[in-house]
């Protein structure tokens, strides 16, 4: 099988592991920097060039598209899709996942529980908007933030109003959510591949922080995800159209709540903590999917 990986940096851990896993299983693997890809779109067909040469014959593509190049990266991925290349995470699914508001709407429509979320635009409605959410603390999130960036905890109603008004002044898109205190700064990262959770870890925020992201100083241990948590994780990925996803849950009094569905989850943390060959599971999923489409 001929596999392309859309990535701007071949030295990143996740990219290197996917290369290793693909070649170990006997496949040809090539890295394509999405920003060096350019395309021809016409009624008579689609074509893609990379550094002066046509790109053809790929059976599958694994998108590792950074948030800063989402629009161009997904356009390149969409071109490959139109050229008949299989991808576990289609371009439209990545765009759904990276828009937090849209993702939460889609999850809620499937009956998947999450922290109560509000969204509004007019400054005159701020007080009523926050009253729909309930008393503070509140969590304010940039709509397209990543890796814990653009996430603010406000402990008083006045602070919530001030942050909301400041973000509106910057023309930033954001959502506001209820704060789940019983989670105590911990969440569960479930790594979904296909129709199963292949690994799960419990992440704990650093002292004085409420964000559990590892690159912000959080710690992680192997987690024994319950059957319900695994089911919610798989349903969440499926609701957005993703076959490979990192689904972040928190354990609450009313059960597991989905915080986010990440369409480009890093492999270093989960493989290091859980000792699971996640990259190999992704390549195996590609093999099975391409084989099914050929039958």
UniProtKB/Swiss-Prot annotation:
Gene name tied to this protein: rimK
Binding site for ATP: 141, 178-179, 187, 211-213
GO cellular component, as recorded: cytoplasm
Record-annotated ATP-grasp domain positions: 104-287
Disulfide bonds: none
Source species of the chain: Xanthomonas oryzae pv. oryzae (strain KACC10331 / KXO85)
Family as reported in the entry's similarity comment: Belongs to the RimK family.
PROSITE patterns listed in its UniProt record: ATP_GRASP (PS50975)
Gene3D superfamilies found in the cross-reference section: 3.40.50.20, ATP-grasp fold, A domain, ATP-grasp fold, B domain
Positions annotated to bind Mg(2+) 2: 260, 262
Residues annotated as binding Mn(2+) 2: 260, 262
GO MF annotations, alphabetized: ATP binding; metal ion binding; ribosomal S6-glutamic acid ligase activity
Record-linked InterPro entries: ATP-grasp, ATP-grasp_RimK-type, ATP_grasp_subdomain_1, RimK, Rimk_N, Rp_bS6_RimK/Lys_biosynth_LsyX
List of residues binding Mg(2+) 1: 248, 260
EC code: 6.3.2.-
Protein name: Probable alpha-L-glutamate ligase
Record's keyword terms, sorted: ATP-binding, Ligase, Magnesium, Manganese, Metal-binding, Nucleotide-binding, Protein biosynthesis
Binding site for Mn(2+) 1: 248, 260
A single GO BP: translation
Cofactor: binding details: Binds 2 magnesium or manganese ions per subunit.
Names of the cofactor(s): Mg(2+); Mn(2+)
């Amino acid at each position: 099988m001929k596999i392309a990986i859309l990535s701007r940096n071949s030295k990143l851990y996740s990219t290197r592991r996917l290369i290793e896993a693909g070649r170990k299983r006997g496949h040809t693997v090539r890295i394509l920097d999405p920003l060096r890809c350019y395309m021809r779109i016409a009624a008579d067909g689609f074509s893609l060039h990379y550094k002066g040469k046509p790109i053809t014959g790929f059976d599958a593509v694994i998108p590792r598209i950074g948030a800063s190049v989402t629009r161009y990266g997904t356009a390149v991925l969409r071109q490959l899709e139109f050229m008949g290349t299989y991808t576990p995470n289609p371009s439209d699914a990545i765009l759904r996942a990276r828009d937090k508001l849209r993702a939460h709407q889609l999850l809620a429509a499937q009956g998947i529980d999450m922290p109560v979320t509000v969204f509004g635009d007019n400054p005159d409605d701020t007080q009523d908007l926050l009253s729909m959410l309930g008393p503070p603390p509140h969590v304010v999130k940039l709509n397209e933030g990543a890796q814990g960036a653009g996430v603010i905890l406000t402990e008083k109603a006045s602070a919530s109003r001030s942050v909301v008004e400041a973000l509106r002044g910057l023309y930033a898109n954001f959502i506001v959510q209820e704060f789940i205190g019983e989670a105590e700064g911990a969440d569960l990262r479930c790594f979904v591949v296909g129709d199963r959770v292949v690994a799960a870890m419990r992440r704990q925020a650093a002292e004085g922080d409420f964000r559990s992201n590892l690159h912000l100083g959080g710690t992680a241990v192997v987690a024994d995800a319950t059957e319900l948590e695994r089911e919610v994780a798989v349903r969440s990925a499926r609701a957005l159209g993703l076959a490979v996803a990192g689904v972040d849950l928190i354990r609450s009094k009313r059960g597991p709540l989905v915080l986010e569905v990440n369409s480009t989850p890093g492999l270093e943390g989960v493989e290091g903590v859980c000792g699971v060959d996640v990259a190999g599971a992704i390549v195996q999923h590609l093999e099975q999917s391409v084989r099914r489409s050929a039958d």
